[in-house]
Amino acid sequence: MNLQFCAGMPKYLYPVPMTLLHILDLLSTFVFALVGARVAADKGLDYGGIAFIAGIASVSGGTLRNIFLGLRPIWIIDPWIITSIIAAVVITLVFRRVTHVGKTLLIMDTFGLAVATMSGTQLSFEMDVTWFAAILLGVITAVTGGLLRDVLCQLEPVLLHRETIGTSALMGAITFVALHQFSFGDNICAIVGGSVVILTRVVSIHFDLHLPKFTK
């Protein structure tokens, strides 16, 4: 197989190796696709609409991240990404009659948020960007899909109105960068940073914490 088109790209972007970054991308893709498909199904979209929303919700953040980094979107060269989206859609359709999945979706979305934040931040560091850019791209990777999902499903964007999704991703990305600056390994940075994302969101939901809103 000719892999010359991958020259200069991080190792995890090759089609074959299963590195930590690759696994993180697959996990976040599957989770975001599953949540997106369920949200679309609950809005009464047809099968095509469900598949479209699942795809947009799962790959838009990583695609935007890679564009900023001058890389090809990972789903173009890695068939496992598309496979994970298809699997998420199929699971949603098979279990479409299952109700009361709100808490389950919230847990999965929180997990996906943590994984995507770590994936975006770590990849940015591999591309030798500044620490500020790494944090920003980590947040972009995590929140873009959910924002587009809500807009396309004609829902009030959770990112802009409720909870602390953006803040949670920001805190996790900052944690990753801080640990990285102290020469901790990528695995430790990702585990601790991801835990911060999850903890921040869980605490904010439990105590109904959110950023202050503008009032006239």
Give, region by region, the residue ranges found by the protein language model:
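Cytoplasmic-side transmembrane-helix entry/capping segments in multi-pass membrane proteins
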Residues: G48-I56, D78-I82, G102-L113, L137, ...
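Ordered, amphipathic secondary-structure segments that act as subunit-interaction surfaces
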Residues: A87-S124
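Structural signature of hydrophobic alpha-helical transmembrane segments
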Residues: T19-T29, P73-I86, T130-A142
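Small-residue-rich transmembrane alpha-helices that serve as helix-helix interface/gating elements
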Residues: I140, A190-V203
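N-terminal topogenic module of multi-pass integral membrane proteins
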Residues: P15-L69, I74
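C-terminal ends of transmembrane helices
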Residues: A33-K43, N66, V89-K103, L147-P157, ...
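Short, structured motif recognition centered on aromatic/hydrophobic residues
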Residues: F52-I56, T63-L69, L136, I140, ...
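Helix-coil boundary and interhelical linker segments in multi-pass alpha-helical membrane proteins
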Residues: M18-L20, I67-I76, T121-A133, A178-C189
